Curated annotation (Swiss-Prot):
Changing residue 251 to S: In HIGM5; fully active and stable when expressed in E.coli; mistargeted to mitochondria rather than the nucleus. Monomer. PANTHER family: URACIL-DNA GLYCOSYLASE. PROSITE patterns: U_DNA_GLYCOSYLASE. The keyword Manganese does not apply. Changing residue 18 to N: Impairs nuclear sorting. The keyword Mitochondrion applies. Changing residue 50 to N/E: Decreases nuclear sorting. This is Uracil-DNA glycosylase. It catalyses: Hydrolyzes single-stranded DNA or mismatched double-stranded DNA and polynucleotides, releasing free uracil; a 2'-deoxyuridine in single-stranded DNA + H2O = a 2'-deoxyribose 5'-monophosphate in single-stranded DNA + uracil; a 2'-deoxyuridine in double-stranded DNA + H2O = a 2'-deoxyribose 5'-monophosphate in double-stranded DNA + uracil. GO terms for cellular component: mitochondrion; nucleoplasm; nucleus.
Length: 313
């Protein structure tokens, strides 16, 4: 039909048009509906508009990457932000020297989640030890004065027992069976050792014996109730720092759990003594007669360090 185009005509070459004399006025590109400019068939015929000052011209290659100085500034700002976050999350009663070297953990998502979990648990249940005693092990000596590391698993879950040192209980709570077996081994291994009549091992901790549980809190009367909540990752970080930044430490790994946790210890740099756990269930499988306490002192003396007075309780 005259005056109408077929679909095919849109894909056919346009017939040549007659050239008319130039108009005395400058040509202006026409507009279509609502004043929108019609597209020209030849983009090269339309002068390109210059981008405003400060903007890249269309089609120009992307700008060069950030300079080394800019990247360094970004990293420093990020590190400063993490430090501020860590400072807000410092737990109650965390020793200063330990905080200096371990505060990097406080801003990590797992630790923030862990602190939230423990806080929520305390709202609904009795949790041991109380908040100000969870990190007793950081208050007894400077992190750089640690000489011996004894790894435990889980805090005691009875009233007034756990106070932030593995195997240790507060006075006047009687020593639990595992600690009683430790005292029995001491009485045969260390000359003149006498049962102290209590279970508080703070005297060892003040001499540089780190008494560290893998999990640092527990719900009352429910052993292992706070396992796999993040404590293991945090105490792994503690052991890792000591492993990498100290020399000649003596690690006492009693039982398969402690031995697994200490499997990454550099045995060329430190001393590792392993045996069965002092629990009544396993004490006769190697703990009695292990002589770990006298052996520890021999190793410390070889390293030029002052031995532990195991009687000082």
């Amino acid at each position: 039909m005259i005056g109408q185009k077929t679909l095919y005509s849109f894909f056919s070459p346009s017939p040549a048009r007659k050239r008319h004399a130039p108009s005395p006025e400058p040509a202006v590109q026409g507009t279509g509906v609502a004043g929108v400019p019609e597209e020209s068939g030849d983009a090269a015929a339309i002068p390109a508009k210059k981008a405003p000052a400060g903007q890249e011209e269309p089609g120009t290659p992307p700008s060069s990457p950030l300079s080394a100085e800019q990247l360094d500034r970004i990293q420093r700002n990020k590190a400063a932000a993490l430090l501020r976050l860590a400072a807000r999350n410092v737990p109650v009663g965390f020793g200063e020297s330990w905080k200096k070297h371990l505060s990097g953990e406080f801003g990590k998502p797992y630790f923030i989640k862990l602190m939230g979990f423990v806080a929520e648990e305390r709202k609904h249940y009795t949790v041991y030890p109380p908040p100000h005693q969870v990190f007793t092990w950081t208050q007894m000596c400077d992190i750089k004065d640690v000489k011996v590391v004894i790894l435990g698993q889980d805090p005691y879950h009875g009233p007034n027992q756990a106070h932030g040192l593995c195997f240790s209980v507060q006075r006047p709570v009687p020593p639990p069976p595992s600690l009683e077996n430790i005292y029995k081994e001491l009485s045969t291994d260390i000359e003149d050792f006498v049962h102290p009549g209590h279970g508080d091992l703070s005297g060892w901790a003040k001499q540089g014996v780190l008494l560290l549980n893998a999990v640092l809190t527990v719900r009352a009367h429910q052993a292992n109730s706070h396992k796999e909540r993040g404590w293991e990752q945090f105490t792994d970080a503690v052991v890792s720092w000591l492993n990498q930044n100290s020399n000649g430490l003596v690690f006492l790994l009693w039982g398969s759990y402690a031995q697994k946790k200490g499997s990454a210890i550099d045995r060329k740099r430190h001393h590792v003594l392993q045996t069965a756990h002092p629990s009544p269930l396993s004490v006769y499988r190697g703990f009695f007669g292990c002589r770990h306490f006298s052996k520890t002192n021999e190793l410390l003396q070889k390293s030029g360090k002052k031995p532990i007075d195991w009687k000082e309780l």
